[in-house]
From Swiss-Prot:
Protein name: Orotate phosphoribosyltransferase
Catalytic activity: orotidine 5'-phosphate + diphosphate = orotate + 5-phospho-alpha-D-ribose 1-diphosphate
Cofactor entry: Mg(2+)
Record lineage: Bacteria, Pseudomonadati, Pseudomonadota, Gammaproteobacteria, Candidatus Pseudothioglobaceae
GO BP annotation list: 'de novo' pyrimidine nucleobase biosynthetic process; 'de novo' UMP biosynthetic process; pyrimidine ribonucleoside biosynthetic process
Gene Ontology CC terms: cytoplasm
Coiled coil stretches, renumbered: none
Gene3D superfamilies for this protein: 3.40.50.2020
GN (gene name): pyrE
Amino acid sequence: MEQYQEDFVEFILDSGALKFGNFTLKSGRISPYFFNVGVFNTGQYLSQLGKFYAIAIENSGLDFDVLFGPSYKGIPLVTATAVAFNNNFNKDVSYSFNRKEVKTYGEGGGIVGHSLEGNILIIDDVITAGTAIHEAVDIIKANGATVKGVIVAVDRQEKGKSGQSAIQEVEQNFGISVFSIINLSNVVDYLKQGNNHALIDRIEVQR
């Protein structure tokens, strides 16, 4: 685990973004943990979050032209990450996001920010059912651009009915790369540093 990944695990635990208990996910599965990106509701939190995304993207070596954040949760993620690229890597990165309701007045259209052209990197929080990514891919292709990949904050590493994880299904269905700041194994490795054996056992059962 890289240092920035360990720092990110600490960040989501200290902020309360990663919670443990019994949660029903969008997919209908019951999970012993839940990642809530809505906790990052201050400028300081968003600044830190954007920096972690930017570091992970830089480390991936992925070449892209525009960052795209699916509305609504992807909007603060993509803007924070674009700012983080400028502040931490001196890179002026283009970004855009979609409107849920297409605007029929003013400049109109369904895309806000940079036009979708070239290679697009999608930013989201997690992939549970893959619905939001499917919609984002459709939007990007409809605008004549190419989906280069997807980055999420946390790879849950949970297998669905197909025997594959949601991320593996997205990679297979769309032929794109999906990577994350951290995955569940990173969280487990971090928890092993403390006396969290019962919690680790519950998490491992879901994998």
